Amino acid sequence: MEKQLKQFYKFLEVDKKVSNNTLQSYKRDLKQFSEYLDEKGIKYNKVTEQDIKEYLEHLSEEEGKKPSTISRTIASIRAFYQYEVKNKKTMQNPTENIQSPKIEKRTPCILTSQEVELLLEQPKDVDLKGTRDKAMLEFAYATGMRVTEIISLNIEDVDLKEGTVMCKNGSRTRTIPLGKMSLDALKEYIEDA
């Protein structure tokens, strides 16, 4: 199964152009699944729907995994077997009839304007680290970008003259305007760095 997994990971990286975080999630999920199969003496191309159900039960009851983790695991295993079926490495996808568990939708905790102001005042720009942290917080607040998106930015992704940033997420790219505070904090960090 190791050889097949390597080919699948290459497909995800090269053809699907998934983000590094997504790729790492697939690797983690499928490594754990592969170890389970080895432990049970089951060949990957002989896995049945019942084997999948027992594995998911193992994750839930013995390992205490949350429904969201189990749902992601199902998606990883399903994608791997879809790839294998498409490439005629196995005859059928044992996850075809497997349903993902219901996931409770949690409403995000929204900060008040006062809390946001307090947060943005936290980094003291007395050194480069403080200037960087202030720029990142202003940037995150102004753009709504995730931390992983911000730290993967390159200097060429930011247009200081236009006041925009190009956010690349996998194969998608979007242009996001920067606010004045964010732009000023970013310029200060670039000048100090």
Predicted segments with their positions:
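Conserved catalytic core of the tyrosine transesterase superfamily
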Residues: 1-193
